[in-house]
A protein has these predicted regions:
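Extracellular and select intracellular beta-sandwich modules with Ser/Thr-enriched
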Residues: 647, 746-750
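Short, surface-exposed loop/turn motifs with a glycine/proline- and acidic-biased composition
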Residues: 713-745
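N-terminal secretory signal peptides that target proteins for export/translocation
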Residues: 1-14
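Extracytoplasmic
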Residues: 321, 405-408, 460-461, 468-469, ...
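Glycine-centered coil/turn sites that cap beta-strands in beta-rich domains
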Residues: 663-678, 682-702, 724-727, 743
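Short beta-strand edge segments in extracellular beta-sheet folds
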Residues: 751-756
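Bacterial N-terminal signal peptides
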Residues: 17-29
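Extracellular, repeat-based ectodomains that mediate carbohydrate processing or recognition
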Residues: 33-477
Length: 756
């Protein structure tokens, strides 16, 4: 220990303390200004107007072979674009390499059938030939399913499957929801809907979804209330489709939760008992009571009587376990059910022989008046059975109220018996709702949700956002580039001429204004600050990176968290998006490699919007296009000043590179050991050696002086032996860092010094 401190003194402890004090003082200043909209991770906007229900799957899919993420939503007149987008069924194909989304309209909204309704969101399937299949239906409005196929950059014409004409005897109930699955062992594609007899029905295809036939009815119940059950599905893609269901709507009945699965054209209980020997004929259609009970109404957990259950998510894993998350009302009066019940989250797990249940925490009150059981929902991780995410107005760590719906990550080390929680969003101004995680792989996670104001399923002002966690890469600290006359022109290349400079709001004259006293560099470029707004010309800021390589890029703008300030930006003119502060995160202390201004007077803060990734080969410069858009949200073209203003400050970029290289050594250690890194001090690489006496899961991470995670070097099961890990710290600033290793019950921290 003394040698470590002596070493630090030799390289300049005064310099390190100076850096640390600057960071700490900036941190104190930022949080004394009531910083809001904090997110753990790089927040990405996928669609500026959209929401989804949770009974259509898959809502999001990853095409790893082509590097795409595909998602679907329904748009609202209350969001960006106003009434012309109302009810549009939309698909977004997000380029995972470039970090840029492309939005398509699958079906334009209209007032008769496809009016705005989040139940109309599409489901997707990546076909065996690489084409994308999208399926959607209108909520409670007709008896049809609609589908389109994406190939070579184009969505084909819409095709209609009319259940009333395709089902023998017709259909007596409207079609809602879409759930697409392909079983390679059968060569069949399935789509499950709510339809005839208010029950789950299926259609199937033997040509990957080009044409379809009626299949059958999955279950049947006596008619009670709105419909006969809600179904969540998951498939292994080979020979089995699992489903979790309720018997009715929890508003109409004290519902329980059941499980079954389809295999070889038959329906089974959890333990493999056949309850329907042919799902394609109407002779034997089981009821939900014939399936395996997962969680019965009136069950007691932690002294709380749970009633009126509803399913949220289901997932099967390679080891044969099945997991589901449900919600239930806590201590509700069965004789006089609450109109605003106390909803709770419950985790259920099947270990191959029995179902068990674990209380997770409070889910919060209803989302809006007529839907007492609508909550923020939850998501199981398809590639990690030990990880879940929930959306709640209560912190699951202590049940304290957080005001709005926040996203929390739960991790278990004992098969779901207990959970450790980490907040993903904090101090949000608006709700974060309905998280979803598509299947990817063990090293990559996509977490998506939508953020905004949810008035009803037919009226919302929300944007789809999310985080991509890719363990194979590291993103260094950001570098900030202030937008000035030296690097910013009009997009056509002509000189930027502004009004000002002064400390006042700029006039509504369709010209950018230089407003002093805010931002980095002492000013911001502003538009639409007063009156009925304005339309200033598009800008282009040129950024010089230090070298060739891959860089993530953000635009920085200022906003009042409770207003609707925004900026339009992109790496190309055609790729520009409108970013409102409600769908963005605030910049935090420590994000950049130098101290920058994060807060201003009048409850203003610096926000960031992710624009994508640039690949620089020989040239080390790139352009960012920036514009205003003072059109009032919820209208197609009404300009407005003040609330829709733009305050542009500058651009941030960060180097992207591989995390580490790992070398395994043939040794037989007797104990857990974390050695001091070598060399130390170092620039830019150092090697960390650790030894394991047994096979164990290892977490090896680097933290800065504030305790913020800088890099994950190892996070996986490792074999016994001695291993070398190299940390590439080319994007880290000078200073002290800590390397922490956790392996089983072993934990140790060492100091490292980056000196540049």
């Amino acid at each position: 220990m003394e040698r470590d401190f002596a070493m630090i003194r030799r390289v300049g402890i005064a310099r390190l303390l100076h850096v640390a004090m600057m960071v700490v003082s900036c941190w104190i200043a930022a949080f004394s200004q009531n910083q809001r909209d904090l997110v753990k991770g790089n927040l990405i906007q996928f669609n500026d107007n959209g929401a989804w229900c949770w009974y259509q799957d898959e809502r999001v899919v990853v095409d790893a072979a082509r590097g795409n993420l595909i998602l679907g939503t329904d748009a609202s007149a209350s969001g960006v674009g106003g009434s012309p987008r109302s009810g549009d069924v939309e698909a977004v194909i997000y380029d995972l390499q470039a970090g840029v989304p492309q939005r398509f309209t699958l079906r334009e909204g209209e007032s008769r059938v496809f009016y705005c309704d989040d139940h109309n969101s599409p489901a997707f399937l990546i076909r065996q030939d690489g084409k994308y299949l999208a399926m959607y239906a209108a909520h409670f409005n007709d008896t049809s399913s609609y589908y389109r196929i994406y190939d070579a950059g184009v969505w084909g014409a819409e095709t209609r499957f009319n259940w009333k004409t395709e089902r023998p005897g017709g259909a007596n109930f409207q079609t809602t929801y879409s759930n697409l699955f392909y079983l390679s062992a059968e060569g069949r594609t399935y789509n499950f809907v709510r339809g005839n007899n208010k029950s789950p029905n299926l259609m199937f295809s033997t040509d990957m979804g080009d044409t379809w036939s009626y299949g059958g009815q999955l279950t049947t119940n006596a008619n009670i209330g709105y419909n006969n059950g809600y179904y969540k599905y998951w498939s292994n893609g080979v020979d089995r489709i699992d489903f979790i269901c309720s018997d009715y709507h929890p508003r109409d009945y004290n519902t329980s939760i059941f499980h079954g699965y389809v295999k070889n054209g038959e329906t089974y209980t959890s333990d493999g008992i056949v309850v329907d020997d042919n799902i394609f004929d109407p002779l034997t259609v089981p009821s939900t009571a014939d399936l395996t009970t997962v969680f019965a109404a009136n069950s007691v957990l932690q002294g709380i009587t749970m009633t009126r259950c509803w399913n949220i998510d289901v997932q099967t894993y390679e080891d044969g376990t099945i997991a589901t998350i449900i919600k239930a009302r806590a201590n509700d009066n069965p004789a006089n059910p609450s109109q605003d019940p106390d909803n709770r989250f419950i985790y259920c797990r099947y270990d191959g022989s029995k179902w068990t249940s674990t209380y997770l925490g409070k889910a919060g009150k209803k989302l809006y008046g007529s839907e007492q059981d609508y909550t923020g929902l939850a998501a199981l991780h398809p590639n990690d059975p030990n990880t879940i995410y929930i959306s709640s107005t209560f912190d699951p760590r202590d049940s304290s109220s957080v005001g709005v719906h926040e996203i929390f990550k739960g991790v278990t080390a004992d098969n779901g018996a207990t959970w450790t929680w980490i907040p993903i969003t904090q101090k949000s101004v608006r709700d974060n709702l309905r998280p979803v995680i598509p299947a990817w792989d063990e090293n990559n996670t996509a977490l998506l949700w939508w953020r905004g104001t949810y008035t009803s399923a037919q009226n919302f002002n929300a944007a789809v956002v999310g985080i991509l966690d890719r363990r194979s890469e590291t993103v260094g600290p950001m570098s900030y580039v202030d937008a000035t006359s030296a690097n910013t022109l009009l997009a056509d290349g002509s000189t930027l001429v502004t009004t000002g400079p002064d400390s006042l709001a700029g006039p509504a004259d369709n010209t950018w204004h230089q407003r002093m006293g805010f931002g980095n560099g002492g000013f911001v470029l502003t538009s639409a600050e007063v009156g009925s707004g304005e339309n200033a010309p598009m800008l282009k800021t040129r950024v010089s990176a230090p070298s060739a390589g891959a860089y993530d890029v953000w635009v920085n703008f200022w906003a009042n968290p409770t207003a609707d300030w925004r900026i339009k930006a992109g790496l190309t003119v055609g790729g520009m998006q409108l970013f409102r502060q409600m769908a963005c995160k605030q910049v935090e202390v420590g994000d950049h490699n130098a101290t920058i201004v994060l807060t201003g007077s009048g409850n203003t803060f610096l926000y960031q919007a992710y624009l994508g990734r640039v690949q620089l080969s020989t040239e080390s410069e790139f352009d960012v296009y920036v514009d205003d858009e003072a059109i009032r949200v919820g209208t197609p073209s009404t300009f407005t000043g003040d609330v829709a203003r733009t305050w542009y400050d500058g651009i941030s970029y960060a180097r992207v590179g591989p995390v580490v290289s790992v070398t395994e050594r043939d040794t037989d250690p007797r104990d857990f050991v974390l050695e001091q890194n070598y060399p130390n001090p170092f620039n830019p690489m150092t090697t960390i050696r650790y030894s394991l006496p047994q096979n164990v899961h290892v977490n090896l991470k680097v933290y800065d002086l504030l305790g913020q995670e800088v890099a994950t070097l190892v996070s996986k099961d490792m074999p016994a032996g001695t291993h070398d890990v190299t940390w590439h710290a080319q994007n880290a600033s000078s200073g002290v860092y800590f390397c922490r290793m956790a392996a089983g019950k072993f934990s140790k921290v060492t100091r490292m010094l980056v000196l540049k």
